Amino acid sequence: MSKTHLTEITFAELGLEPQVLAGVEAKGFHNCTPIQAETIPLLLTGKNIAGQAQTGTGKTIAFLAGTFNYLLTHSASAERRQNQPRVLIMAPTRELAVQIYNDAVPMSESCGFKMGLAYGGDGYDKQLAVLQEGVDLLIGTTGRIIDYLKQGIIDLGAIQVVVLDEADRMFDLGFIKDIRFLFRRMPPPAQRLNMLFSATLSLRVQELAYEHMNEPQHIQIEPEQMTGQRIKEELFYPSNEDKMLLLLTLMEEDWPEKAIIFANTKHGCEDVHAWLQADGHRVGLLTGDVPQKKRLKILEDFTAGLLDVLVATDVAARGLHIPDVSHVFNYDLPDDAEDYVHRIGRTGRAGRSGHAISFACEDYAFNLPEIEEYTHHPIPVSKYDPSALLDDVTAPKRVVRHRLPVNRNMRDRQSTGRRRPGNKS
């Protein structure tokens, strides 16, 4: 197993159909990642896949290349109706469904297949209009897919390829009954190409694979290095009093090019967002109750570099590929050890290095033993000098739940706060 992100194997060597290869190369991909090099040859021979790989290792392109190649080499049923897609790709979140769709666009164009999206929270009529015209590939979340299915807008009787992405997250969010409902309305497993991908493959996920797939090949990439060799991990033990000031101080010292800060609650995220915004950072807030259009706009701005910091709950921790994230902060240690791996997996992607900083505060330090047991290593501890923390921070204009000590020198100044070195703002 190569220690580098890319292998010496190129997509051109795999035997992909020319149209698929053109779509892959249109996205700038030439050499395969390990998960791509191991799974695509199996998919081209019709093997079912249950694949495990760290986030950011290219599993989306792996299953998309396998899917489009299968469509080109296998004819649709002669009895297939307009409302019957040939492919169903299921994702746990709206954001991931949209991301998969966007990643698939070059291949859909080069191969000549139509795609549709189905996810809740936004765009019902627009999605409906596309589906009524007929699609080859349907990508979406289970709830909206079932909604269209029960209305007769779509029918799954002609499905030839099914993909389940982030399967462990499906369990976490309680979607497994929905998934089984959809599987029962498809042709039997032996008549489909089936793929299941996840950053972790627990026993329950493997049981799901064997229940609804045809002798799946279990592919596991770098299981021993769960948190990524390119991620520098660091742990602080701040008091609740120092916690916000420590975050602001570290942000001031490092000026991350692109950072994601995770908190465990919506209110916690709102507080962190307010303090960073008051301190002059270009920061976005992503929590579960942010409207869908605004969520997508925030992600687009963060990806494009219009925002430097994203404060989020775990809604953004799984599946999303945001390139060039230099820092991840666990402002709160997560309650679920798997979420720690998924959170810090936002950085150190595509062969780049990353920095993951975690706070074991008075409220969440008890989560640390489970995290270190799950990752099979202790997180290196760093100390800080409380007297060296920032002492002239700008108070947010709105009232927030997190109060800094009254002896700190907070000034309610009208300036835009600190600015990134190099005159970036």
Swiss-Prot record:
GO terms for molecular function: ATP binding; ATP hydrolysis activity; RNA binding; RNA helicase activity. Residues 416-425 have a biased composition (Basic residues). It is found in: Cytoplasm. Residues 243-390 form the Helicase C-terminal domain. Pfam families: DEAD (PF00270), Helicase_C (PF00271). A motif (DEAD box) lies at residues 165-168. A motif (Q motif) lies at residues 9-37. The keyword Lyase does not apply. Keywords: ATP-binding, Cytoplasm, Helicase, Hydrolase, Nucleotide-binding, RNA-binding. SMART domains: DEXDc, HELICc. Its main location: cytoplasm. GO terms for biological process: RNA catabolic process. The keyword Cytoplasm applies. One of its GO terms (cellular component) is cytosol. Transmembrane segments: none annotated. Its EC number is 3.6.4.13. Signal peptide: none annotated. It catalyses: ATP + H2O = ADP + phosphate + H(+). Component of the RNA degradosome, which is a multiprotein complex involved in RNA processing and mRNA degradation. Belongs to the DEAD box helicase family. RhlB subfamily. This is ATP-dependent RNA helicase RhlB.
